[in-house]
Amino acid sequence: GLGDVYKRQVNKTSLRVRFSEVDSMQIVWHGEYVRYFEDGREAFGREFAGLGYMDIHASGYTAPIVELQLQYKKPLRVNDTAVVETRYIATEAAKICFEYTIRSATDGEIVAEGSSTQVFLDARGELQLLAPEFYRKWKERWDVK
């Protein structure tokens, strides 16, 4: 069922907070979480082949972020380890939608949550209102409804 598909299209990738990512309060600077989400998308694209940035580019498209939501729950500090869970959210629209949960690797507590939406632009920079063929094929391959 759809619940199985939803559970199946999840990537988990680990990270360790680097010194360069913290601010003067010794916690991860808020903007770094956007990069952690990107790390999650990249890992997702490697696991679910065909939806990585280079796959999209090779198909003649770009997929810029047009919406990003981020909610901070608990700070991370230098050398903390965390797990970024990236979930693909199926949609009929010509968009790529993800939800993210970042958890502390030590206690499993949620440190941040969010979502992103990407659209498709062709080589001329034109917004695609219909899903590109490579995206439709990717959905078929991974049994996305």
Residue ranges and their predicted role:
Residues G1-Y6:
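Short, small-residue-biased leader/transition segments that mark boundaries at the very start
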Residues K7-V83, I89-K145:
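Terminal targeting signals and extreme-terminal segments of soluble enzymes
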